Amino acid sequence: MPELPEVETTLRGLSPHLVGQRIHGVILRRPDLRWPIPEQIERLLPGATITNVRRRAKYLLIDTDAGGSALLHLGMSGSLRVLPGDTLPRAHDHVDISLQNGRVLRFNDPRRFGCLLWQSDIQAHELLAALGPEPLSEAFTGDYLHALAYGRRAPVKTFLMDQAVVVGVGNIYAAESLHCAGISPLREAGKVSLDRYRRLAAAVKDILSYAIRRGGTTLRDFISPDGAPGYFEQELTVYGREGEPCKQCGRVLKHAMIGQRATVWCGSCQR
């Protein structure tokens, strides 16, 4: 599933091609993705101008002058690309938003776990209202994590992946950040010290920022809007490396399921 760096990479690739463009038309090749596509998409988008494209957590928000915003999620396998308007659709190209400049924003989603929704007051949308802070914002600190973790017995990895705690830190980057900070993913969230949470918050920021610069992580499905893969996969220290040696100490990496997610860590470097 695309995580925050992949969605941010998509945003940065799309934004220059979309902001200021007038929408010519919308083609829906199916009426639903994960949820039904609301009728406002076909009714309100044609003729509207895109005023901004931004990200909240793993959602892309396309603001318009039509009194609302389109909310998109890439799901497990979705991708968004801006293409010449005469590009023939392929399998799983479910949505086309054609632009006045002759190009088309195309949403491809083989597994249909993505979504395309509409909201007049986008920050009030139920998918966004209860989200925690952005991990790259000033609000996300070790002190914040330590205070919120007080008394919690869930594993720290589960805590870090809770979208009400902090948004956009999925399985890949939670595992990598915990390894960087030297914290076992099995440790109870409420038993991690303030100093270690400060190291963890710094690790999350550093790793996400670096992953964005590297274009995200290509694991099976993610391709950036220009068709290029993400290169952070080449930098992974623990994720997907069960049974291999730790890059820091050489010990064999451990593997377990935590919160129904495959988790890899170093029993020597992470305590």
Curated annotation (Swiss-Prot):
UniProtKB keywords: DNA damage, DNA repair, DNA-binding, Glycosidase, Hydrolase, Lyase, Metal-binding, Multifunctional enzyme, Zinc, Zinc-finger
Annotated cofactor note: Binds 1 zinc ion per subunit.
Entry EC no(s): 3.2.2.23, 4.2.99.18
Classification via InterPro entries: DNA_glyclase/AP_lyase_DNA-bd, DNA_glyclase_Znf_dom_DNA_BS, Formamido-pyr_DNA_Glyclase, FPG_cat, MutM-like_N-ter, Ribosomal_uS13-like_H2TH, Znf_DNA_glyclase/AP_lyase, Znf_FPG/IleRS
Keyword Signal part of the UniProt annotation: no
A Pfam family this chain is assigned to: H2TH
GO molecular function: 8-oxo-7,8-dihydroguanine DNA N-glycosylase activity; class I DNA-(apurinic or apyrimidinic site) endonuclease activity; damaged DNA binding; zinc ion binding
Domain of life: Bacteria
Zinc finger (FPG-type): 237-271
Cofactor: Zn(2+)
Residues annotated for DNA binding in this entry: 92, 111, 152
Catalytic activity: Hydrolysis of DNA containing ring-opened 7-methylguanine residues, releasing 2,6-diamino-4-hydroxy-5-(N-methyl)formamidopyrimidine; 2'-deoxyribonucleotide-(2'-deoxyribose 5'-phosphate)-2'-deoxyribonucleotide-DNA = a 3'-end 2'-deoxyribonucleotide-(2,3-dehydro-2,3-deoxyribose 5'-phosphate)-DNA + a 5'-end 5'-phospho-2'-deoxyribonucleoside-DNA + H(+)
Subunit annotation: Monomer.
Protein name (Swiss-Prot/TrEMBL): Formamidopyrimidine-DNA glycosylase
Species this chain originates from: Xanthomonas oryzae pv. oryzae (strain KACC10331 / KXO85)
Gene name as annotated: mutM
